[in-house]
Regions:
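Conserved N-terminal segment of class I S-adenosyl-L-methionine
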Residues: 1-76, 103
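Short conserved AdoMet
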Residues: 35, 97, 111
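Surface-exposed loop/turn positions
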Residues: 38, 81-83, 114
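A short acidic, Gly/Pro-enriched loop at the edge of an enzyme's catalytic core
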Residues: 75-87
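Active-site micro-motifs of SAM-dependent methyltransferase domains
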Residues: 76, 94, 123
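A short beta-strand submotif of the Rossmann-like class I SAM-dependent methyltransferase core
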Residues: 86-92, 118
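A short glycine-rich, Lys/Arg-flanked "PGG" loop and its adjoining helix->strand segment in the class I
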Residues: 100-115
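Conserved class I S-adenosyl-L-methionine
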Residues: 117-124
Length: 124
């Protein structure tokens, strides 16, 4: 996704209170599931909305964004083994070319007892 598209997503977020309310509910649910074992990494931070609700999280995206902390490829997480307490993946898994590579990378960087918290859209 390009920076221009992500900027448009941020603008939509600012205009749509109902969208904010829905996601803020889920952000609270996600945060409640995080364990206190170390840093929390958000994969696919995009518009930066989760970062606003969880400022201490390390926010990242494949696209370089000035409002996020890191630019990275989710398939190749640039962290030491067993260095993270949580990884949050919100509406991202379906965008990954090799989701199993990501799962393996997440398993490597999470501490024992750490959590991979994922939420995916479902349209049926």
């Amino acid at each position: 996704m390009s920076l221009q598209i992500l900027e448009k997503h941020r603008a939509v977020w600012q205009r749509k209170k109902i969208l904010q309310d829905i996601y803020l509910y889920w952000y609270k649910q996600i945060r409640a599931q995080c364990v206190d074992l170390g840093p929390t990494l958000e994969i696919g931070g995009g518009g930066g909305n989760f970062k606003e609700s969880f400022p201490e999280a390390i926010s990242s995206d494949y696209t370089l964004c000035p409002w996020l902390d890191l630019n990275l490829d989710a398939h190749l997480l640039p962290f030491r083994s067993e260095s993270l307490g949580n990884i949050v993946v919100l509406d991202v898994l379906h965008h990954l070319n090799r989701p199993l590579y990501f799962i393996e990378a997440a398993q490597r960087v999470l501490k024992k007892g750490g959590r991979l918290i994922m939420l995916e859209p479902c349209i049926t």
